[in-house]
């Protein structure tokens, strides 16, 4: 008689179902904030960052990396995050600061401003990516954190929504580049606007793609988005 196979005692791999609060729980009993930025890649406009402290008992459903969500889903989640979060804040670094510091340090500055603006001080921050920014509290970096941590996912949504609104406003102030549609990223209308109008006050003039577009050396269908990615 064949014996039935024994049940495996090996731990089962985690089944991915989207972001959860496991990373937050692993940080211990203190306040944990998620931190993420938006706008490292575009050729124009500020870089934004958000810091969010979530109540584990009131986590909005549907949180995910902001880039994976529709504009409608992000707008709904932004409202809910702001309603239920223990604390949240969005920080910005200007085009002048980006040009002076470089985009990576400007993103870190925006993160500092977001954390400093929280109504309560976090004990630790979960930061998307692998770069160890100098922030106002201890940090833990999380690669692809906006797909793993609800707090980071919430921060990614707030940062993107805040920056997108700014770029819509910039489109009205600086028409002809299509900022409202592409939010400062590479697009045919953006390249053509640079060729026809020259740079606006919010363009990142030190960036190679902007220089190439202004010199007429970047095709409108080129796949080059930025110098750094992100």
UniProtKB/Swiss-Prot annotation:
<feature type="binding site">
    <location>
        <position position="36"/>
    </location>
    <ligand>
        <name>a divalent metal cation</name>
    </ligand>
</feature>
<dbReference type="GO" id="GO:0006298">
    <property type="term" value="P:mismatch repair"/>
</dbReference>
<dbReference type="InterPro" id="IPR001352">
    <property type="entry name" value="RNase_HII/HIII"/>
</dbReference>
<keyword id="KW-0963">Cytoplasm</keyword>
<dbReference type="GO" id="GO:0003723">
    <property type="term" value="F:RNA binding"/>
</dbReference>
<dbReference type="InterPro" id="IPR022898">
    <property type="entry name" value="RNase_HII"/>
</dbReference>
<keyword id="KW-0464">Manganese</keyword>
<comment type="function">
    <text>Endonuclease that specifically degrades the RNA of RNA-DNA hybrids.</text>
</comment>
<feature type="binding site">
    <location>
        <position position="128"/>
    </location>
    <ligand>
        <name>a divalent metal cation</name>
    </ligand>
</feature>
<keyword id="KW-0378">Hydrolase</keyword>
<dbReference type="GO" id="GO:0004523">
    <property type="term" value="F:RNA-DNA hybrid ribonuclease activity"/>
</dbReference>
<feature type="domain" description="RNase H type-2">
    <location>
        <begin position="30"/>
        <end position="219"/>
    </location>
</feature>
<dbReference type="GO" id="GO:0043137">
    <property type="term" value="P:DNA replication, removal of RNA primer"/>
</dbReference>
<dbReference type="InterPro" id="IPR012337">
    <property type="entry name" value="RNaseH-like_sf"/>
</dbReference>
<feature type="binding site">
    <location>
        <position position="37"/>
    </location>
    <ligand>
        <name>a divalent metal cation</name>
    </ligand>
</feature>
<dbReference type="InterPro" id="IPR036397">
    <property type="entry name" value="RNaseH_sf"/>
</dbReference>
<comment type="similarity">
    <text>Belongs to the RNase HII family.</text>
</comment>
<dbReference type="Pfam" id="PF01351">
    <property type="entry name" value="RNase_HII"/>
</dbReference>
<dbReference type="InterPro" id="IPR024567">
    <property type="entry name" value="RNase_HII/HIII_dom"/>
</dbReference>
<protein>
    <recommendedName>
        <fullName>Ribonuclease HII</fullName>
        <ecNumber>3.1.26.4</ecNumber>
    </recommendedName>
</protein>
<keyword id="KW-0479">Metal-binding</keyword>
<dbReference type="GO" id="GO:0032299">
    <property type="term" value="C:ribonuclease H2 complex"/>
</dbReference>
<keyword id="KW-0540">Nuclease</keyword>
<dbReference type="GO" id="GO:0030145">
    <property type="term" value="F:manganese ion binding"/>
</dbReference>
<keyword id="KW-0255">Endonuclease</keyword>
<dbReference type="GO" id="GO:0005737">
    <property type="term" value="C:cytoplasm"/>
</dbReference>
């Amino acid at each position: 008689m064949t014996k039935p196979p024994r049940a495996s005692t090996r731990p089962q791999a985690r089944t991915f179902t989207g972001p959860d609060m496991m990373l937050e729980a692993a940080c211990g009993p203190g306040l944990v904030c998620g931190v993420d930025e938006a706008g490292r890649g575009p050729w124009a406009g500020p870089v934004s960052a958000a810091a969010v402290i979530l109540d584990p008992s009131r986590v909005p459903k549907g949180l995910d990396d902001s880039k994976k969500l529709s504009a409608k889903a992000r707008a709904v989640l932004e409202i809910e995050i702001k309603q239920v979060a223990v604390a949240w804040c969005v920080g910005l670094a200007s085009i002048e600061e980006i040009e002076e510091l470089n985009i990576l340090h400007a993103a870190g500055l925006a993160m500092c401003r977001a954390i400093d603006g929280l109504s309560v001080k976090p004990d630790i921050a979960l930061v998307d990516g692998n770069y160890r920014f100098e922030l106002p509290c201890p940090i833990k970096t999380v690669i692809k954190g906006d797909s793993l941590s609800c707090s980071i996912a919430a921060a990614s949504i707030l940062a993107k929504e805040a920056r997108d609104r700014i770029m819509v406003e910039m489109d009205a102030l600086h028409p002809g580049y299509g900022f409202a549609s592409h939010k400062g990223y590479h697009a045919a209308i953006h390249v053509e606007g640079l060729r026809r109008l020259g740079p606006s006050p919010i363009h990142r003039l030190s960036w190679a793609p902007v220089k190439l577009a202004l010199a007429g050396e970047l095709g409108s269908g080129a796949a080059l988005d930025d110098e750094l990615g992100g």
